[in-house]
Amino acid sequence: MTLSRETFTPENVMMREAKDGTVPAKYQELILKDVMQNSKIMQLSQYVEMDDLAKTFQVFLDGPGAYWVDEGNRIQTSAPSYKNITIQAHKLAVILPVSNEYLKYQAGDFFNVMQPRIAEAFYKKFDEAAILGVDNPFKFSLSQSSTAAGDDIQGDITYQNILALEDKITDNDNEPNAFVSKAQNNTLLRNAQLVQNGVVQSLYDRQNGEIDGLATVNLKSTNMKKGELFVGDFDYAYYGIPGTIEYTISNDAQLSTITAADGKPVNLFEQDMSALRATMTVGFMIVKDGAFSHLTPKAAAASTSASSSTGK
C-alpha cells in the first residue's frame, strides 16, 4: 500500500493544525494586490520584477541618445547615460493579535478574515520606511534623498513654498510628477493662495486630488507631521517584491510592541489570544538624488533638532 502525503489546502486544514508555513497562493495574491494598490510609494514608483533578494538592472538617467544625420560630415553624437544599479530586498514582518477562536477556522476562512489586516500592516510599514525613513532597512527614502541633495525647505505650506519645492526638482533638471501629503494638510493647501490684481490663484485642486496639476496621495501616518509635504520625480524610485508570504502563529509570547487598554504589553496566554506573524520581502531604492524635495514646518524641524541634541 502506498501512502500519499496530504496536501495543505485552505479547504482541508484547520488553523490549529497549521500554525506555520506559507500563506496559500490565493490569499497571497489578494494580499499583494491589496498592498500594491494601497501603498503610496508603490502607487507612484516603478515596479521591478525580482526573483531573488537582490537584482541588478540598467536604468537610463540622462541624455537623449539621439543625433542629427548629415551626409558627408562627421556627426557629433550625444550619448545617453545609463547606470547599473542593484535593488536589495529586506524581510518585513508584522505581528497581529488574534482571538484563539480563529484557530478553529479552516485555513481559507482564517486568511479571508486576516488578509486585509495583513496587507494594511505591510503597506503602512513599508510606506513609513520608504517615504519618511522610519525604521528603514533600506539605504534610501524620500526624506534621506531630499536631505542628501540639499533640497529640504523649512517653512509653512504656502503658495510660494509649494512652487519653491517644485523648483528644487526642476533646478536639478528633473520633472516632478507627484506629491505626497496627508489629510491634515488639506486646509493648509486650500489656504495656500496668491492674490494678484484682485484675482485669487490656488495650486490645490481637492476635487481631482492634485497640487499644481500633479497627482497627490495622502499618507496616513502619525510619523508624518502636519505641514510636511514631499514632491518628486518618481520615475527614479523603484520597488520589487520577491519571494512568498510566510506566517507563524504563537500563543506563548508577550507582545512588547502592542499594548492593552491599561498600557501594558499584551500577554497572549493571559488573554486567550494568539499572535499571527507574517513576513514578506520587499525592495526599494532611489537611483538619483535631486529627484525629491521635502517641505518641513519650522516647529517640527526645531523639535527634531532639539531631540537630536539632547539624545532623546
What are these regions (language model features)?
Residues 1-29, 264-312:
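Protruding loop/beta-arch "assembly-hinge" segments enriched in small, turn-prone residues
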Residues 15-94, 158, 291:
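Assembly/oligomerization interface modules of large self-assembling protein complexes
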Residues 22, 26-30, 36, 109, ...:
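Generic recognition of stable, solvent-exposed alpha-helical segments in well-folded globular domains
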Residues 60-61, 99, 182-184, 279-281:
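Structured loops at beta-to-helix junctions and adjacent beta-edge loops in soluble globular domains
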Residues 94-172, 294, 303-311:
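Alpha-helical scaffold segments that mediate packing/assembly in large oligomeric complexes
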Residues 153-270, 274, 280, 308-312:
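Extended oligomerization regions of viral-like shell subunits
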